[in-house]
Amino acid sequence: LFGPIAGLVIGLIGHALVDFTAYGPWWSWIIASGVFGLLTGLFLGKLDLESGEFGKKQIILFNVSQLIAHVICWGLVAPVLDIVIYNEPLEKLFAQGLTAGIVNAITTGVVGTVLLVAYAKTRTKKGSLNRE
């Protein structure tokens, strides 16, 4: 809805606030959340939700896109940054990333799809208004 820059900033700030108020910041995962927001913003730009259309094709595109973004962020970005920033053991990282990626992808797939369908229904469909 707002684009890749907003997605990046929202991902960074949202994850950082949760970490700061809970147990302390884990920068590799904060950055991965920002990258997820960036990628999602890029992918969602292709959906054209403002047209009021969010059918089967758009649902599939959204879910394939968010799945790719989760694989990149939690299977690559977070584990690599954990190694670079925190010198974490390799065995643990990819198992952690895989688990987080699967859970996040399922959550995004279910909740995200429901929210996007609901949002699209609030938009006026192209060609639904006639000039008199």
Where are these regions (language model features)?
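Loop-helix junctions at membrane interfaces
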Residues: L1-E132
